[in-house]
Amino acid sequence: MNAPDKFTSLLSLTREPFPASHKCLIPGSRPDLNVPVRDVLLTNGETVSLYDTSGPYTDAKVEIDVRRGLPGVRGAWITERNDTESYEGRSHQALDEGLKHAHDHDAQRLAELRAGASALQRTPRRAKAGANVTQMHYARRGIVTPEMEYVALRENGKREWMAEYLANEERAKRVAGNPMGASIPRIITPEFVRDEVARGRAIIPANINHPEVEPMAIGRNFKVKINANIGNSAVTSSIEEEVEKLVWAIRWGADNVMDLSTGKNIHTTRDWIVRNSPVPIGTVPIYQALEKVGGVAEDLTWEIFRDTLIEQAEQGIDYFTIHAGVRLPFIHLTADRMTGIVSRGGSIMAKWCIAHHKESFLYERFEDICDIMKAYDVSFSLGDGLRPGSGADANDEAQFAELRTLGELTQIAWKHDVQTMIEGPGHVPMHMIQANMDEQLKHCHEAPFYTLGPLTIDIAPGYDHISSAIGAAMIGWAGTAMLCYVTPKEHLGLPDRDDVKQGIIAYKIAAHAADVAKGHPGARSRDDALSKARFEFRWQDQFNLGLDPDTAREFHDETLPKDSSKVAHFCSMCGPKFCSMKITQEVREYAAKKGVAEAEAMAEGMAQKSREFMAGGGEIYIPIQPAS
């Protein structure tokens, strides 16, 4: 099967619209600014509108050809600013796919993949001489861009349906969240988005060479976002599988995706992914740079790394993880750790520093990196190369020395108006999580925090998506802006599509729990809508309002598969006689019939049962009468 056919076959499994759902567009101030949301039609006639990350893939009305990529929704916005220029760009080299593969005998296969990707190529753009094209640069000059308006509309969504669930003032006050120092307005305006980006408290990752991206914001005063990692390795996965993983990930709610490919055809894989992604794409450029020198860390040079940054910026990568905080003076601090340096990027740079006994070129050349970033509006994700790899190493001096350095680098990036977020751990026991957030806010000036979990315990291989989602929910409530998912395969192997889904669902739970705890406007309304459906035994609505309708329906149908069970006033947990919600409904119906309050109905019912008990002789144990 050739590549395009395989793409089509794989994506056909991933493009199914969600049940009882359709896309709806929220119009902006201009004809080409429309924000998609997912409307769920309930069986009682209500409609619930949900934030949607799936792009056009779940829209049955849209035809998608992955060989041509998605439409460039931001193309006109970028062009009309008149501060960028098209140019020829660097030529693709065999070395871009990795040194080993530049010398292998698979040239024909590589040529086929490149030919298949040729229709995806866009002529790259960059800032005109002396210009700065970052969203932070515009924001600091008081300009509200279409991207900022898009974010505001997206964060607000359609709130009309929430009115019923927000009307009870007593309940709203009782369950109101604690924002933990965040400043979340009731309504997100474009001006608020601009101000948050200008302050550096939020970023909108949106490379000018990724016009297909649907703008989103990462910041503690916005919804908590999640990131999913995909990417091949030297031993497994193909380009087709990685593109399908991308579409699968955003279907289930990934707000961002990182391509962490370290195997063959790295450049070509990225072409396919970026051109077909409606969400921001991030990378760790040092991985590809290492491939270019055959995997020998000490052979890395600034020139090779710089060329890799430009290569990826031209392709449209929206944010780079750069481990510029791994400095020579810090490496000895990891010597007594239980698990040493566990970050791949961190270990690469540590090895380079030790081999040359020199300061990291990422640190020394940081301002040169800023010049590249602001020419394409690539955001920094300042990597935590010295993050703890076990609970025993949490919050040590190596971790916090690097964090303080990342704060210093943030100030340098902001001097160039480059958008910046800070990466965090890792492995942190529950009682040490708040200290991580406190230190980050103290030293990194409220730049968005982006954490990998953290895992709260180390004894759950195969279940690390659960052990880490606990920490993710806690640190998300404390102020982390984006959570990097962990799959069941963490520490064990490369995740497949089912692992990706499980990791995303676990992290959607964590992110939503954090939003509810923070009191994010409207966050709890979806919970209330599902709770109402549950109480009213609207099973289909329960399934369809959940994070994973497929699994909910499957679990229900394992014991009650008949269609009649979808309207039954009980489930297999309690059965028809002991369903608490059914009993409560009967009490309410009895009260309504008698024209009394629920409490009175309960009292009357108890009195009636008392009379029946006494009339029966007042005996606790009644002899069984033989059947006549």
From Swiss-Prot:
Residues annotated as binding Zn(2+): 427, 491
Gene3D superfamilies: 6.10.250.620, Radical SAM ThiC family, central domain
Any one cellular-component term (Gene Ontology): cytosol
Pfam families the UniProt entry points to: ThiC-associated, ThiC_Rad_SAM
Pathway(s) this gene product operates in, as recorded in its UniProt entry: Cofactor biosynthesis; thiamine diphosphate biosynthesis
Keyword S-adenosyl-L-methionine assigned: yes
Matching InterPro entries: ThiC (IPR037509), ThiC-associated_dom (IPR025747), ThiC/Bza_core_dom (IPR038521), ThiC/BzaA/B (IPR002817)
EC number: 4.1.99.17
Family listed: Belongs to the ThiC family.
Function: Catalyzes the synthesis of the hydroxymethylpyrimidine phosphate (HMP-P) moiety of thiamine from aminoimidazole ribotide (AIR) in a radical S-adenosyl-L-methionine (SAM)-dependent reaction.
Complexes and interactors: Homodimer.
The protein's name: Phosphomethylpyrimidine synthase
Gene designation: thiC
